[in-house]
């Protein structure tokens, strides 16, 4: 296996725009376009021209993000986004790397800015649940309360990235997959903190 094998395709803004508009009938019926990960906020300047072109057509835009990106990036895309899907990382602690403190502060700033300027009905919070955190739900719940998050979607972890890790020559850490019963217990614990939740199966 060539670890440097190119597994993506480069597109110009106009090429992407033309591809997206193939589904114009869906958008006319009330559908929209979602930008997701990687982390789209880290490509804010690159996707900005595309966001602008799409909004000129009156198409609804959503973004799925961890909010771990510079506040400047958030500010760039904010005027064009109608719905926000926030992939919370509270179950891991915080993303730790050489920019740990910067990323942590950026998350705080972005979340605060978003909550202050966007009606809550346009924000969806999600969190992946693995067996390893089932005894730490109280800690997670307190953090959710701290950030005024009263409704969250719980997603059981999966191993869909396993083959990609193998292709890249990296070690894949398999977290424990929670059962539906364990997810139900998790939801009950969150409810004790007045946090409503719903779970999805993969």
For the regions a protein language model found, what residue spans apply to each?
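A C-terminal junction/extension of Radical SAM enzymes
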Residues: 180-202
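Peripheral (non-transmembrane) domains and long loops of multi-pass membrane proteins
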Residues: 166-172
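Canonical Radical SAM [4Fe-4S] cluster-binding loop centered on the CxxxCxxC motif
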Residues: 1-11
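A short acidic, glycine-rich active-site loop
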Residues: 97-105, 172-184
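Conserved AdoMet/S-adenosylmethionine-binding subsite of the radical SAM
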Residues: 17, 21-161, 166
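Short, flexible active-site loop motifs that bind/organize anionic cofactors or intermediates
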Residues: 6-7, 37, 97, 173
């Amino acid at each position: 296996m060539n670890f440097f094998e190119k597994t993506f395709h480069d597109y110009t803004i106009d090429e992407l725009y033309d591809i997206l508009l193939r589904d114009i009938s869906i958008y006319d019926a009330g559908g929209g376009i979602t930008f997701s990960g990687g982390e789209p906020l880290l490509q804010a300047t690159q996707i900005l021209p595309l966001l602008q072109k799409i909004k000129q057509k009156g198409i609804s835009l959503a973004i799925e993000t961890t909010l771990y990106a510079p506040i400047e990036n958030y500010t760039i895309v904010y005027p064009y986004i109608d719905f926000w899907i926030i992939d919370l990382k509270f179950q891991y602690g915080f993303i730790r790397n050489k920019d740990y403190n910067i990323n942590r502060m950026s998350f705080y700033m972005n979340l605060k800015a978003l909550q202050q300027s966007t009606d809550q009905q346009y924000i969806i919070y999600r969190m992946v649940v693995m067996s390893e955190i089932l005894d730490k739900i109280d800690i997670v719940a307190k953090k959710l309360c701290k950030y005024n998050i009263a409704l969250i979607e719980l997603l059981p972890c999966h191993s869909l990235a396993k083959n990609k890790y193998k292709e890249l020559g990296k070690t894949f850490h398999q977290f424990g997959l929670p059962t539906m019963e364990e997810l139900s217990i998790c939801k009950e614990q969150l409810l004790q903190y007045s946090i409503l939740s719903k779970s999805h199966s993969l």
